[in-house]
C-alpha cells in the first residue's frame, strides 16, 4: 500500500507493477496487488485502471485484493471484466464491516466507492447507537459474503481497521472457525 502522499509531493516515479517486477527478480514471492471494482480515484478511466491491474498481474502478482465495496454487482461486473481482459488470477473481494457509517462514508468518498441508498437508509437514525450499528454492519457484511459465495467466490479479505472483533464474529457466524475451536 502506498498510503496517502504528503501534500505537494508529486506523483511517484515507481508504480506497483514495477515493485512486483523487482520483487520477482529477487525471489518467487507470493504477491497480492490492489484492484478497484469502482475504479481507482486517480485512474483516467475504468479501462486504464483495468490495464494497470493487467500490468501488475503480468509482472507476476499471484492474486488481487479489491478495494472495499458495498455494491456486490460492481464486484461481479469487475470480475467479469478482469476475465475478459485476460486477468487470470483470483480477484479477492475486500469486505469492510461497517460499525461507524460516518467514517465509512468518509472512506468511500476518498476512494471512489459508492454507498447504495439502501445501505445509508439502514444506518439512518443510528448515530448514537453503536451496538445497533455494529449489528447492522455485521449483517450487511454477512449478506455480501453469502451472495459472493453463491457466485463462486471462495476467499475474502476483511478490512478490520485494527478492530478484529467484528470480523471475527462475522466469520464465526458464517461457520469459519480456527482449528483449535473445531476439535
Where do the model's predicted regions map?
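Active-site-adjacent beta->alpha loops and helix N-cap segments on the catalytic face
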Residues: 1-23, 43-48, 68-83, 163-169, ...
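Active-site beta-loop-alpha junctions enriched in small/polar residues
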Residues: 1, 34-40, 69-70, 94-98, ...
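Conserved small/polar residues in nucleotide/adenosyl-binding loops
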Residues: 180-182
Amino acid at each position: 500500500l502506498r498510503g496517502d502522499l504528503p501534500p505537494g509531493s508529486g506523483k511517484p516515479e515507481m508504480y506497483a507493477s514495477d515493485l512486483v517486477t523487482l520483487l520477482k527478480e529477487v525471489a518467487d514471492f507470493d504477491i497480492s496487488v490492489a484492484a478497484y471494482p469502482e475504479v481507482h480515484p486517480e485512474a483516467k478511466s475504468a479501462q486504464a485502471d483495468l490495464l494497470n491491474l493487467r500490468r501488475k498481474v503480468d509482472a507476476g502478482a499471484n492474486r488481487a485484493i479489491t478495494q472495499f465495496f458495498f455494491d456486490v454487482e460492481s464486484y461481479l461486473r469487475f470480475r467479469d471484466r478482469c476475465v475478459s481482459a485476460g486477468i487470470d488470477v483470483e480477484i479477492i473481494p475486500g469486505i469492510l464491516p461497517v460499525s461507524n457509517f460516518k467514517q465509512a462514508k468518509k472512506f468511500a468518498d476518498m476512494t471512489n466507492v459508492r454507498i447504495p441508498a439502501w445501505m445509508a437508509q439502514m444506518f439512518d437514525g443510528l448515530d448514537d447507537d453503536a451496538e445497533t450499528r455494529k449489528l447492522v454492519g455485521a449483517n450487511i457484511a454477512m449478506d455480501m459474503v453469502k451472495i459472493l459465495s453463491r457466485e463462486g467466490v471462495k476467499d475474502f479479505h476483511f478490512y478490520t481497521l485494527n478492530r478484529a472483533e467484528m470480523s471475527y464474529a462475522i466469520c464465526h457466524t458464517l461457520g469459519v472457525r480456527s482449528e483449535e475451536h473445531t476439535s
